[in-house]
C-alpha cells in the first residue's frame, strides 16, 4: 500500500479487488417514495448496472461506440439527466450509493425518455477498480462531493493522490477530470492534489479554476448559493500522459 500523505483510500489488492478501510461517504438510507420505488422496478433491468458483474464492455452496454462520460455521486440525478438529454451523442454512466437518489434519477430519466444513461448503485471507487476499463472514458465528473470540512476528516475526501492516479488510467488520452465544489478549502485541496498528480494539465488559463462550463447545468442549490454570495469552484484537468 502506498504511504503517500493523507488519503481516503487505504487499499490493498486481494484477488484483484481493492480493499478499502476508509470511505469518502456515509451511507444514509432515506425512504423511497412510491414514484422512486416504481422507477427502480421499471427501469433498473434496462438502465441498471451491477458491480458484481465485473468489467464492462461499454460498446455492448450502450449498443454503440459513442464517447462515455462518468459521474461520481450524482445525488438526485437532475443535472445528470439534463446532461444526458442535452447530449444524445454521448453515453453517460452515473454512480450513487443512496437509493432514493438512484430512484429519483431513474424516474426523471424515464420521464425524459433518454436511452444514453446507465446507473450503478455502489461505491464509486470499487466500480472504477472493478468495472471500468483503462482508457475508456472521455470525461469523469465529480460535482459537489462531501467536503469533510473538519480537518480530522480530510483523509475521507475522495480527491486524493492514489484515487487520481487510478482514474487517470481510465481516462482516454485528452480526457478530462471535471470537479466542482462550493467549499473553498476543498477547492484548494483539489487544486493542490491535481497540480501534484503526474500526467494531467490544468485547463485553466490562470492555472487554478475555470468558469462553470455550459455543459454543467446550474443546480437550484447553486442558484441559491449565488444569491447568498457563496462561491463555486470548477476545476478541469486534461490527461496528457
From Swiss-Prot:
InterPro entries: SAM-dependent_MTases_sf, tRNA_(Gua-N-7)_MeTrfase_Trmb, tRNA_methyltr_TrmB_bact
A Gene Ontology cellular-component term: tRNA methyltransferase complex
GO molecular function: tRNA (guanine(46)-N7)-methyltransferase activity
Family annotation (Gene3D superfamilies): Vaccinia Virus protein VP39
Positions annotated as active site in the UniProt record: 146
Keywords on record: Methyltransferase, S-adenosyl-L-methionine, Transferase, tRNA processing
Catalytic activity from the UniProt record: guanosine(46) in tRNA + S-adenosyl-L-methionine = N(7)-methylguanosine(46) in tRNA + S-adenosyl-L-homocysteine
Residues the record lists as binding S-adenosyl-L-methionine: 71, 96, 123, 146
Family recorded in the similarity comment: Belongs to the class I-like SAM-binding methyltransferase superfamily. TrmB family.
Functional summary from the UniProt entry: Catalyzes the formation of N(7)-methylguanine at position 46 (m7G46) in tRNA.
Protein name: tRNA (guanine-N(7)-)-methyltransferase
Organism this protein belongs to: Pseudoalteromonas translucida (strain TAC 125)
Species classification: Bacteria, Pseudomonadati, Pseudomonadota, Gammaproteobacteria, Alteromonadales
Amino acid at each position: 500500500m502506498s504511504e503517500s500523505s493523507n488519503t481516503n483510500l487505504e487499499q490493498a489488492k486481494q484477488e484483484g479487488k481493492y480493499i478499502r478501510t476508509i470511505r469518502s461517504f456515509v451511507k444514509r438510507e432515506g425512504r423511497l417514495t412510491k414514484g422512486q420505488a416504481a422507477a427502480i422496478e421499471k427501469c433498473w433491468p434496462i438502465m441498471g448496472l451491477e458491480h458484481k458483474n465485473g468489467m464492462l464492455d461499454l460498446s455492448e452496454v450502450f449498443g454503440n461506440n459513442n464517447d462515455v462520460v462518468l459521474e461520481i455521486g450524482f445525488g438526485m440525478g437532475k443535472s445528470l439527466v439534463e446532461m444526458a438529454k442535452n447530449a444524445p451523442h454521448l453515453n453517460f454512466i452515473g454512480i450513487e450509493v443512496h437509493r432514493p437518489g438512484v430512484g429519483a434519477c431513474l424516474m426523471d430519466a424515464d420521464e425524459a425518455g433518454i436511452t444514453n444513461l446507465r446507473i450503478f448503485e455502489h461505491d464509486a471507487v470499487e466500480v472504477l477498480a472493478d468495472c471500468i476499463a483503462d482508457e475508456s472514458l472521455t470525461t469523469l465528473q465529480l460535482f459537489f462531493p462531501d467536503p469533510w470540512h473538519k480537518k480530522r476528516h480530510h483523509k475521507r475526501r475522495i480527491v486524493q493522490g492514489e484515487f487520481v492516479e487510478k482514474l487517470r488510467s481510465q481516462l482516454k488520452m485528452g480526457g478530462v477530470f471535471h470537479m466542482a465544489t462550493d467549499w473553498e478549502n476543498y477547492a484548494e485541496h483539489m487544486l493542490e492534489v491535481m497540480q501534484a498528480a503526474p500526467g494531467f494539465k490544468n485547463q485553466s488559463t490562470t492555472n487554478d479554476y475555470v468558469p462553470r462550463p455550459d455543459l454543467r447545468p446550474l443546480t437550484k442549490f447553486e442558484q441559491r448559493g449565488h444569491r447568498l454570495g457563496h462561491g463555486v469552484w470548477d476545476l478541469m484537468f486534461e490527461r496528457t500522459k
